[in-house]
Amino acid sequence: MKVLLHLPALLASLTLLQTAASASDDPTAETDIIHDTVEEVKVWVNKAFLDSRDRLKMAMTTKIHSTRHLSDYLKHAKGRTRTAIRSGQVWEESLKKLSQFLTNVTGQGLDLTLLSWEAGCDPPAPTMTCNISSPYRTITGYCNNRKNPALGSANRALARWLPAEYEDGLSLPYGWTPGKMRNGFPLPQPREVSNQIAAYLNEEDVLDQKRSMLFMQWGQIVDHDMDFAPETEMGSDTYTKAQCDEHCIQGDNCFPIMFPPGDPKLKTQGKCMPFFRAGFVCPTPPYKSLAREQINALTSFLDASLVYSPEPSLANRLRNLSSPLGLMAVNEEVSDNGRPFPPFVKMKPSPCEVINATAGVPCFLAGDSRASEQILLATSHTLFIREHNRLATELSRLNPHWDRETLYQEARKIMGAFIQITTFRDYLPILLGDEMQKWIPPYQGYNESVDPRISNVFTFALRFGHLEIPSTVYRLDENYQPWGSESELPLHTVFFNTWRLVKDGGIDPLVRGLLAKNAKLMHQNKMMTGELRNKLFQPNHTIHGFDLASINIQRSRDHGQPGYNSWRAFCGLSQPKTLEELSAVMKNEVLAKKLMDLYGTPSNIDIWLGAVAEPLVHRGRVGPLLTCLLGQQFQRIRDGDRFWWENPGVFTEKQRESLQKMSFSRLVCDNTGIDKVPLNPFQANAYPHGFVDCSSIDKLDLSPWASVKE
């Protein structure tokens, strides 16, 4: 079906200059103009993407490195994700060019369906046939919903629970145009907000007396299993990333974070922190909105995709296809006291080698490109591949007639259930506290009318976890005492730090630290440690770090996020308008005044900051707004997942009973040299109180998976 857009309406939204030129009445004229324009745009968009990849490779081989290079490595789009983002870039740039010189090409409007086809956007029709009888998820998440196979699959737009809010109604973020008002007030610079609200002078952390480091780390695991929005490239044939990196020149997809007067970073890092906008996808029929929509490169489901990847080609590379046992590939060069590490990435040199050239240990290859971002995350990935291989090996003993594919898929299915169970049984109740039942009622079965897509706002709600990260990572010995001469590692030294795992102790000392050390408490007066607020991706003294709080604020504007009060209204909460009302919501007059001085109105407070600033709910670790946003999202990914572990038919009744015995403590017992673990690993634990021998921890009984060969 031909979908048309009346151009005057578009131009009002784009605020672009329009010439008086008009095309011929020839019905082929529009087709030719669209084709020629898209082909022209493709040339320089493709060049920008190629240049970016080459520049990243070159950056890793030079002796002068920057925080930007390390960030680029994490946020660099690959495979199908890269293709989807490139098509979105071509679509948007082509639309801008067409709107500059066309008035009414055919007398009816611009054919957006044709434009989408020329730009390489996904066709509306399904691109694959779904095997509705398959007991296994697809790698991409496609076919989960039988009526709408693409729902929740990888490389689609994040869902909008509220309409996007951009300066121009289309793509420009608020804060882009100097002096531009929002709700009658100018927006403050993100770094200024960070300096005044997120910082604290005394760097001593306020530790959470009831939550372990594992509680913090599990939040990142869940996040990396459900959402990832890589950055896009420059949108212009004349503007380069170098201009953004080196000269802080705002333009196209460069949106630098400027340092305010008096900021200490002005002396060491110049005028700004470089910031590139998130990748986005083409609009989809029926084109009711042309506002920029950011991509989710992952499946929306809690399915262990961080272990297995949502990208089919990578998923295959992560497997040991030479083994008949359905195993994941492991590192053939190094091991951890005989236990496997993940394979190394092939990129030479990788950022992990760059930050410690002497050690020369590459980053790990995993289902998620961020696996080596920090040492505790790399430790978690190591545990997961070990557990997969343990499960696959045990299943092969039970079912020697099963082929490699069945063993792989069954182990993968169990791993997905483990992450689901651990998240909903152990993590969410102590995160959402007394509010959990309000937002996540007991499971009633799969509902195909529930939209499981990750919402755009959820990608900011989950960033509350940044305020739970302490300034130190601990390594402990078998008696849970300090391990070696460097038992306490400053947080900024563990980014891209695989060499510590491979050459300095393995994962066991770090796992003990996860179990026996405390998370940081999310505190209104001590929000974010300076290790993240000033030293993000600063692995050594030669590289100056980023500010994660500023990035979160700038990213929310990049995504066109509505402000604090809009989300309070969405959740049925009060919308403060005055200092007194905001003070009552925050239960903190000093904080409320700082926010009002910066933003002018509570309506303008950036969603991430407003949400994390709220006082915690009873027995939880987030405030009322976050319990709403997090609770609704987790309810949707559970009820809208056809392969949810509790959905009848996914597992047998006996298998479900057995799966409930799985626990993180058992995962540790089965895949490390640790023999004493806490009964409640997500709660704060002080050894030996609450610790038991591994023989006291329930094991997963795999006998319900035994089958008789037909």
UniProtKB/Swiss-Prot annotation:
Binds 1 Ca(2+) ion per heterodimer. The modification 3'-nitrotyrosine is found at Y480. Its cofactor is Ca(2+); heme b. One of its GO terms (biological process) is defense response to bacterium. PROSITE patterns: PEROXIDASE_3 (PS50292). It is found in: Secreted; Cytoplasm. Disruption phenotype: Knockout mice exhibit inflammation and lesions in the cardiovascular, respiratory, digestive or excretory systems, neuropathology, and tumors, with high incidence. Expressed in the colon, including colonocytes and mucin-containing goblet cells. Not detected in the ileum. The record marks R370 as: Transition state stabilizer. GO terms for cellular component: basolateral plasma membrane; cytoplasm; extracellular space. It catalyses: 2 a phenolic donor + H2O2 = 2 a phenolic radical donor + 2 H2O; thiocyanate + H2O2 + H(+) = hypothiocyanous acid + H2O; iodide + H2O2 = hypoiodite + H2O. It comes from the Eukaryota. It is an enzyme of class 1 (oxidoreductase). Heme b binds at D223, E373, H466. Its main location: secreted. It holds the Pfam family An_peroxidase. Disulfide bonds join C130-C143, C244-C254, C248-C272, C352-C363, C571-C628, C669-C694. InterPro entries: Haem_peroxidase_animal (IPR019791), Haem_peroxidase_sf (IPR010255), Haem_peroxidase_sf_animal (IPR037120). Keywords: Antimicrobial, Calcium, Cytoplasm, Disulfide bond, Heme, Iron, Metal-binding, Nitration, Oxidoreductase, Peroxidase, Phosphoprotein, Secreted, Signal. The active site is at H224 (proton acceptor). Residues 24-80 form a propeptide. One of its GO terms (molecular function) is heme binding. Its EC number is 1.11.1.7. Belongs to the peroxidase family. Heme-containing oxidoreductase which catalyzes the conversion of thiocyanate (SCN(-)) into antimicrobial agent hypothiocyanous acid (OSCN(-)) in the presence of hydrogen peroxide (H2O2). Also involved in the conversion of iodide (I(-)) into hypoiodite (IO(-)) in the presence of H2O2. Responsible for the inactivation of a wide range of micro-organisms and hence, important component of defense mechanism. May be implicated in airway host defense against infection. This is Lactoperoxidase.
